[in-house]
């Protein structure tokens, strides 16, 4: 079946009142970026839904991209028909023959924005229902919870028919909730936290700490590839690489073993806050889950958060590890996350870190190092790269990865 357009129904936009138009405008921009590889499309955002005219572009490929755009409740591939009931009958029958298995229940649901059309919604429902009952007597009309709905939209230019409704990504259009920094490690949790941030409309930038020669180029490439895994939801994400070797060596030399992780995390948070403020970010996201590791007890979080007044948001804080893994598998980051490349969070990890560090002790040990100088030098070495979904960073590591797995 050759579809004419895809009809998009908005998600939570219906609750946004006076800001609705701004939300629709942002969604329109996000959809346009997501579908930029299909130049013949015409995208028409309306108050209650969006119409994407295919103009010959492949509907399956367009819908695959569309399914990853946040702010969409669902969408339907539709066929445009002239406002001639004989032609509407013919296309409706063809559509049902191709999509409705024998013996299922269905109903006709008509919406009419063209009130000059001869048939109102009830008359249209009855007309098409009678015709289909005559031509497909195996189908059962059922008004409540049918197996299939034949949706009909009567508009000025044509009548649109559809039988499929495909679930969208939900959430809010990315960018409508502001911009934030995400502390991205190479693990399972932080990409999932990034996914949830995007779903709530937050435009994220990745902050990743890199400690050569203790961490490898493969580890850096892995973090960039994890970023690329999330870009289909937004179009592009900035990856901010922060050199962290000198800081880790200084902490290792001057801070007692039990407080290494706490002070290291405090410096990471200080640097992330500084970068976020420079770039106009409103909050910091991370992948911490309460009690999962020593640095993620409430006492550790309190001692680490002490260095910032910026909001710290933890989308996976109350999730079990199995729940986080299931979400990582769903968004296709899990296999990449478990590749065994060391990140800077693990290379100097003490065997027995404090699970209940004291904030005053963390401050004291931190005072033993030149925080200002270390931060200045790290910030001077920051590298920023724009990452898109088509970018590949792991190709050069294929043989190594295959051997490791």
Swiss-Prot record:
PROSITE patterns: THUMP
Pathways per UniProt: Cofactor biosynthesis; thiamine diphosphate biosynthesis
Record's GO cellular component terms: cytosol
Superkingdom in the source lineage: Bacteria
Record carries keyword ATP-binding: yes
Pfam families: ThiI (PF02568), ThiI_fer (PF22025), THUMP (PF02926)
Compartments reported by the entry: Cytoplasm
All residue ranges annotated as the THUMP domain in the record: 60-165
SMART domains from the UniProt entry: THUMP (SM00981)
Role, per record: Catalyzes the ATP-dependent transfer of a sulfur to tRNA to produce 4-thiouridine in position 8 of tRNAs, which functions as a near-UV photosensor. Also catalyzes the transfer of sulfur to the sulfur carrier protein ThiS, forming ThiS-thiocarboxylate. This is a step in the synthesis of thiazole, in the thiamine biosynthesis pathway. The sulfur is donated as persulfide by IscS.
NCBIfam families: tRNA uracil 4-sulfurtransferase ThiI
Protein name: Probable tRNA sulfurtransferase
Protein's gene: thiI
């Amino acid at each position: 079946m050759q579809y004419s357009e895809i009809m998009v129904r908005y998600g939570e936009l219906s609750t946004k009142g006076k800001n609705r138009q701004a939300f629709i405008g942002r969604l329109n921009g996000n959809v346009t970026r997501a579908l930029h590889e299909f130049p013949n499309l015409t995208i028409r955002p309306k108050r209650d839904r969006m119409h994407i005219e295919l103009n010959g572009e492949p509907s399956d490929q367009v819908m695959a991209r569309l399914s990853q755009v946040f702010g969409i409740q669902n969408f339907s591939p539709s066929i445009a028909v002239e406002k001639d009931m004989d032609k509407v009958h013919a296309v409706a029958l063809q559509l049902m023959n191709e999509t409705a298995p024998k013996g299922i229940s269905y109903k006709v649901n008509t919406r009419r924005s063209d009130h000059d059309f001869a048939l109102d919604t009830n008359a249209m429902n009855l007309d098409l229902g009678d015709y289909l009952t005559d031509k497909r007597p195996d189908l059962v009309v059922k008004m409540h919870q049918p197996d299939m709905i034949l949706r009909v939209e009567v508009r000025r230019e044509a009548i649109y028919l559809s039988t499929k409704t495909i679930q969208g990504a939900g959430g809010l259009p990315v960018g409508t909730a502001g911009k934030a920094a995400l502390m991205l490690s190479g693990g399972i949790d932080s990409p999932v936290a990034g996914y949830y941030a995007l779903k709530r409309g937050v435009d994220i930038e990745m902050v990743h700490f890199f400690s050569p020669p203790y961490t490898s180029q493969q580890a850096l490439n892995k973090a960039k590839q994890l970023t690329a895994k999330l870009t289909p939801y937004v179009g592009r994400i900035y990856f901010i690489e922060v050199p962290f070797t000198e800081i880790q060596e200084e902490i290792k030399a001057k801070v007692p073993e039990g407080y290494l992780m706490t002070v290291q995390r405090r410096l990471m948070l200080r640097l992330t806050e500084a970068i976020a403020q420079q770039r106009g970010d409103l909050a910091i996201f991370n992948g911490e889950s309460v009690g999962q590791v020593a640095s993620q007890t409430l006492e550790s979080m309190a001692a680490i958060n002490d260095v910032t007044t910026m909001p710290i948001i933890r989308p996976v804080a109350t999730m079990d590890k199995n729940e986080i893994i299931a979400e990582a598998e769903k968004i296709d980051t899990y296999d990449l996350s478990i590749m065994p490349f060391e990140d800077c969070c693990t290379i100097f990890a003490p065997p027995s870190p404090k699970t209940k560090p004291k904030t005053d002790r963390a401050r004291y040990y931190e005072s033993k190092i030149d925080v200002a100088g270390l931060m200045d030098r790290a910030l001077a070495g920051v590298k920023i790269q724009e990452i898109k979904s088509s970018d590949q960073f792991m190709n050069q590591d294929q043989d190594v990865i295959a051997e490791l797995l």
